Amino acid sequence: MQVEVKLKENAYKVYIDELEELEFDSKVFILSNPKISGLHLKTLLSKIKAREIFIAAVKDGEEYKNLSTMEEILNQMFNSKLDRKSVLISFGGGVISDMGGFAASIYQRGIDFINIPTTLLACVDAAVGGKTGVNNNFGKNLIGTFYQPKAVYCESSFLKTLSSRELAAGMAEFIKMAAMFDDSILDFIEKIDEKSFLNATCENEIFTQIIARSIELKSRVVEQDEKESGLRMLLNYGHTFAHVIENFTDYKLYLHGEAVAIGMVMANQLALNLGFLDKMQSQKIKDILLKFGLPISYKINNVDEFYEAFFMDKKSSNKKINFVLAGPLGKGLIKGDISKEDIIATLREFQ
């Protein structure tokens, strides 16, 4: 199965379960992590033909997605004597995808890169759309670029080695898509047998459908708003809260998808308080998140500090915070005129 991301420039295809032989008349630099290298690198190498192949495995996890790791990656790229015709392959989850794309975008002012995601979260979100970057002390993904891959290959077979926690985190991003753009997908999600899904014993077709439907939705959004000036901001549903939570917990307590799950619950509470969402729909999202074992609560110790952290969000402008809300489910909206009092009141509900 193929989905084309039809951009005015740099259009590319996403191949689902179609990873066959990849031939390059250039050097290839594979960026991965030790776990994925141990599980799947042999499979990938059997499919690649290139002049030379270099492999770099860096520590994986949001706490390592920083400029220090980026410098380590770039040093290995320079030591490999890559040129502008070389190709970087990001082979891993969302962290590897973000860092690999960023490295490709700044190495000698840009070389081609391909994403081969190995987590559900990366398949449904991080690997498609061209957002790259790293975190710093001020927040998440505040240093980065928009830089599109030349192709994306999503293989459902790689997902079979994921833990239930990793699969659930990926499902959170799929739920996000449904809540923003197509609430009928929520009905599909409710019918999934969570036990076989979380054990990765479900049929490959389930993974394929999740990946395909996510990418079809996201590609349409990116085609209309590549640089996130409007519509694409809806893909950040739950993320305004999630990024603060991740930063406050040093990126160690929650997987990204888990933080997004909590963020969606918080965003829904704000939408509920403002009258954009009703209790039944808010509860529906909670029930689906709980179905897959995702967290739905976070204790805010300092409301004022949490509120101030919102202003480091990339969607904030002119001293206003742009919140992405569901209202109703399947129809996202962006609100930049919510009073501080209303925001604080919602945050106090999570103390």
UniProtKB/Swiss-Prot annotation:
NAD(+) binds at residues 60-65, 94-98, 118-119, 131, 140, 158-161. Binds 1 divalent metal cation per subunit. Can use either Co(2+) or Zn(2+). It holds the Pfam family DHQS_C. It is found in: Cytoplasm. GO terms for molecular function: 3-dehydroquinate synthase activity; metal ion binding; nucleotide binding. Keywords: Amino-acid biosynthesis, Aromatic amino acid biosynthesis, Cobalt, Cytoplasm, Lyase, Metal-binding, NAD, Nucleotide-binding, Zinc. Its main location: cytoplasm. Zn(2+) binds at E173, H239, H256. One of its GO terms (cellular component) is cytoplasm. It is an enzyme of class 4 (lyase). Pathway: Metabolic intermediate biosynthesis; chorismate biosynthesis; chorismate from D-erythrose 4-phosphate and phosphoenolpyruvate: step 2/7. Its cofactor is Co(2+); Zn(2+); NAD(+). It catalyses: 7-phospho-2-dehydro-3-deoxy-D-arabino-heptonate = 3-dehydroquinate + phosphate. Its EC number is 4.2.3.4. PANTHER family: 3-DEHYDROQUINATE SYNTHASE (PTHR43622), 3-DEHYDROQUINATE SYNTHASE, CHLOROPLASTIC (PTHR43622:SF7). Belongs to the sugar phosphate cyclases superfamily. Dehydroquinate synthase family. Catalyzes the conversion of 3-deoxy-D-arabino-heptulosonate 7-phosphate (DAHP) to dehydroquinate (DHQ). HAMAP family: DHQ_synthase (MF_00110). This is 3-dehydroquinate synthase. The gene is aroB.
